Amino acid sequence: MHQDNSMRRAINQSRNGGSDSCDINNDREHDNINRNSYINNFHIENINSDKNEQSYIYCSDRAQVTDSILGNRKYTHEENINSTEMFSRTNYEYSNKNNVDIEMYNISNNNFYNGNNNGHSNDIIDYINNNNVNKDLSNTSNNADINTYIKKLTSNQSTAYCDGKGYNESANGSNFDINFRDVIKNNNNKNYKNNNHVPDDMLELGDRSFDSSFYIHNNVEEIDTERSNRLSFMSKLKMYFNYFGPGWIVAIAYLDPGNICGNLNVGLIRSDDFINVNSSVKDYTGYRLLWVLVYGHILGFIFHTLSMKLGHITGLDLAALCRKEFSSKFSYFLYICVQIAIWGAHLQAIIGVFVAINLILGIPVKIAILYTLIEAFAYSFLENKSLDLLEKVLSLLIGILVCCFMFNVFMTPINFQEVASSILYPRIPKGKLLDTMGLLGSVISAHIFYLHSNLTSKKKPVIYNDRMVKRYNKLGTIESGGSLLVSCITNCIIVLTFAEVNISGDDRKADYNLFNAYDVMKKYFGKTSMYIWSFGLLSSGNNASFMCEYASKSVFEGFLNKNVNPFFRVIFSRIILFIMLYAYVSYDKYTIDQLSNFINVVQILLLPLAIIPLYRFSIHKNVLGKFAIKGAFKYLVFVLVISIIVANFLLTLFDFLQYAPSNLYVIFIFISSIFYLLFIIYFFNMPITKTYYKDS
């Protein structure tokens, strides 16, 4: 019990040159005192259980610390969290510390921006080191608990935003500190404990315990700022692999079965001039649209850098920012629309999975669909187990997919001169305008930007300053560029594989799909190639399915600020998708193409719901501050946003009008188009009023 007085004296002497002071609580010597020390984010709390007395010490301001200890003044909660003078930037690891009830303390936005989230007062460290708190870690049963604490301290991810939502907000939208702690000792990182008696109605999604699976041990930050610019190549490589994850998961969206189906159809495009000529004449029309894939991935890279910066700087994902800025009704509307886009992509992913199962094992399609339910259990296990494990599994599946499709390209004689000509000299084959627009529209989907911002929000720098933010942005840019480069090459390989197929006019079908593409592979490349194609398709479907599940989780929590059991969420969505697919397959498995085309149209229409808020937040200084895009790049992105919206809108409009059964249908499409454009204009002009960025 004398340790509390020692600590107060240690901090007191740092202020008053060694002079002692009176105690806040005169009953400290009682054995029934319940002492809890919370050592994180410059915060200590001592609670007297008898008198229910609480004294808070916020070490972000040394004067406030001493005055609080002396009892000279009660500082308000708002004053404490808005204090700007830091105590220390040192990142201590509390190894060999036991008999201290260490609790993780989630702080508000404003307090977090004041400096190192893992900094601690030197006086506090001295107190722990000098008062027999140290124990041999090997002799304690709390080894795992303290290692978890160390893991969090050294994490490259923000303790203020556990799972992306470590904040809370009042009715007027302003941030406040919910005083929630995750008790490390004896809670196995799962149990909830509200030691501050915070009212239940103030506790929302952010009030969840720390999940160590979201954190990695090796820190991306280099604490020694004097040596930070002289990092070795291996250190930089290590930092990259520590960051590794978000970009590769997002790249899955560019390699889903829907994109694969579009790629093979583009590769099998043949000019009308070659339809009736001898099959020995080579037709390179299938090469002509490679430029769409290349430039589409470049567009995706630009928007992914914006979503990546949004997560790093604000610690919030795109969905959470929309919820905080817009009304609850509008947030619900956005959530429903984005969730529809996710379900559409998920349907295409499941189609690829059961088609691959049907090709590999010869199982009937209706039975192969059941595999998707097994896959749901696998995803639920991975999500509950560890996000890091999920990232590794997805990366493995991406590797399998890329290897399978690259193996096929070695079996085809690629004309690299035609490849270069297509990329450097963009042109559209005669009568293939809609195919071109459709391919461009399928490359970029709305939900991937929500997902990317969610993943990068977990990578927010623990040590928050301009240098660290720039480092994280650089790591994110490299990773996004590398993953999208691999995705672009893989998509081009699929196009080139089918572009090299010398199909005569008699063999050329109007449309190829995932069900009959294997006929082409088997006929022109052999049975082995067909199986390799099928395994690549299976990997693509599994990847995309897992990615859609996680995207669904992120938008649900971001827009609604609610949480639901992952098992029930996954099973519920899979049952709905299972019923829809089973109904389509029971009618005719080839009608899946019609469903896929309809999904592509929906994805195109919903894309503005992602790129508009992403652009708006990226240019606003209240959101990104000095990191907001400006100058020529700002106007370039604006032109790209408008061009994508207009191009996709015209594509959809022409597609609908092409099959208009009556004049009444045309009128309906025309009126709907007007409302759609008015909504886009309204969305573009919605104000952004709150501030999320604060100078470090």
UniProtKB/Swiss-Prot annotation:
Coiled coil: none annotated. GO terms for molecular function: cadmium ion transmembrane transporter activity; manganese ion transmembrane transporter activity. GO terms for biological process: iron ion transmembrane transport. Disruption phenotype: Repeated attempts to generate a knockout failed. Conditional knockdown results in severe growth defects in parasites during blood stages. Reduced pathogenicity in mice. Reduced sensitivity of parasites to antimalarial drug artemisinin. InterPro entries: NRAMP_fam (IPR001046). It is a multi-pass membrane protein. Residues 11-24 have a biased composition (Polar residues). Its main location: membrane. Residues 256-288, 358-362, 417-435, 500-529, 586-596, 658-662 are vacuolar. Belongs to the NRAMP (TC 2.A.55) family. This is Divalent metal transporter 1. It comes from Plasmodium yoelii. The gene is FVRT1.
